[in-house]
């Protein structure tokens, strides 16, 4: 009986390993772009091809949004994924045991995206649910250097095998995926515990006063790449003007400090806001973590649709933050440009949503 059970288990294991091999081969054959296997990981995180652990450059990242597979191959992939989830996933999960639980991120992810996954890993560990970690990805080094405790919930590639439990779920619903208590626990224990970041906060708190306004403007590929612009590009000037009007119902800022990846654009397009308060377009500090510290230190904050800014606002909840304003949309859902969320998943419910003055979408310009 024991020998039979072992034999059956061995056969099942071999079948699933063959399925794993053919799954990876299928991914390679159905992608039309030479780089696309790096991005198109399984939506449930059931496998990760070797190239998914490699660094990608900016042009490759843009390809995620611009490369389109032929309709036939997309249909074949849809059918394959449906069969996989219905009949094979549960058997694969049966073989995956052990205390380690790996969270996967897409190679196009950056710091703001990773923080949601690190927060989930920290929460699972805090509650004793799983020994969870985020799988290492290129570029994480600067984050684990700035916030050393994040290294303790980051798994090296050597820990990721076929038999490792894993999840490809991206926990971005800040009100449902993590409680306020757990969010604040993660920020205190893993971010504010950093001596280097605490020093940055101290410096930036000397830059602001009790009525300072910080405006975080995301530019970059949101506006330089048409396909990405269609998904994320908001009418920044009109939005910032409308947000400032709404803020002035409560307070007139003593000064306005801009944080952006394109401060020159801000100076050229938003300098007229100096009629409300003195504007500072010079970079405060030397790198992105100084920017994050400044956003977190803001008593009053106007955000655009960027996860980096969202995390600055989350951190600010534990500091001297008073009011946060954000656009009423994060992105357009590609499958349905009219899909509209009453609250973008990454936005906190106490943030003030800024609506278009003409009742339009900030991104598409269409009436809602």
Predicted regions and their residues:
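Membrane-proximal basic amphipathic "stem/tether" segments
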Residues: 5-6, 12-26, 31, 39-103, ...
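A structural signal for short, well-ordered beta-strand segments and their strand-loop junctions
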Residues: 103-104, 131-137, 214-216, 257-259, ...
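Short amphipathic alpha-helix
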Residues: 116-124
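A short, glycine/small-residue-rich beta-strand->loop->alpha-helix junction that serves as a flexible
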Residues: 106-116
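A general structural motif
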Residues: 98-101, 129-131, 210-212, 251-255, ...
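Secretory-pathway luminal glycosyltransferase catalytic domains
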Residues: 95-101, 137-251, 345, 350, ...
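Donor-binding and catalytic core of enzymes assembling or modifying cell-surface/extracellular glycoconjugates
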Residues: 111, 248-334, 338-340
């Amino acid at each position: 009986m024991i020998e039979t059970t072992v034999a059956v288990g061995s056969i099942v294991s071999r079948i699933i390993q063959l399925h794993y091999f053919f799954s990876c081969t299928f991914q390679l054959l159905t992608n039309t772009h030479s780089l696309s296997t790096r991005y198109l990981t399984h939506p449930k995180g059931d496998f990760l091809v070797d190239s998914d652990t490699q660094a990608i450059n900016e042009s490759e990242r843009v390809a995620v949004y611009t490369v389109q597979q032929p309709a036939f191959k997309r249909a074949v992939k849809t059918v394959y994924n449906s069969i996989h989830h219905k009949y094979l996933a549960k058997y694969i999960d049966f073989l995956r045991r052990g205390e380690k639980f790996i969270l996967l991120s897409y190679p196009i992810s950056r710091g703001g995206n990773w923080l949601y996954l690190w927060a989930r890993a920290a929460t699972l560990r805090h509650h004793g649910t799983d020994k969870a970690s985020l799988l290492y990805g290129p570029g994480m080094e600067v984050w684990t250097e700035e916030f050393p405790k994040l290294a303790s919930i980051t798994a090296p590639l050597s820990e990721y095998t076929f038999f490792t439990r894993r999840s490809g779920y991206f926990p971005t619903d800040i009100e449902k995926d993590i409680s306020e208590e757990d969010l604040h626990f993660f920020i205190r224990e893993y971010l504010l515990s950093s001596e280097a970041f605490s020093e940055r906060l101290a410096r930036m708190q000397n830059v602001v006063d009790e009525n300072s306004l910080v405006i975080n403007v995301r530019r970059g590929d949101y506006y330089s790449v048409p396909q990405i612009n269609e998904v994320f590009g908001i009418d920044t000037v009109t939005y910032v003007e409308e947000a400032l009007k709404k803020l002035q119902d409560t307070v007139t800022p003593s000064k306005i400090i801009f944080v952006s990846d394109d401060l020159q654009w801000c100076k050229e397009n938003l300098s007229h806001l100096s009629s409300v308060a003195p504007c500072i377009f010079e970079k405060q500090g030397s790198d992105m973590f100084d920017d994050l510290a400044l956003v977190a230190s803001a008593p009053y904050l106007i955000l655009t649709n960027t996860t980096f800014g969202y995390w600055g606002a989350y951190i600010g909840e534990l500091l001297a933050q008073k009011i946060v304003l954000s656009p009423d949309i994060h992105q357009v859902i590609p499958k349905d440009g009219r899909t509209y969320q009453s609250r973008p998943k990454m936005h906190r419910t106490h943030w003030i949503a800024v609506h278009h003055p003409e009742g339009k979408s900030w991104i598409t310009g269409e009436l809602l």
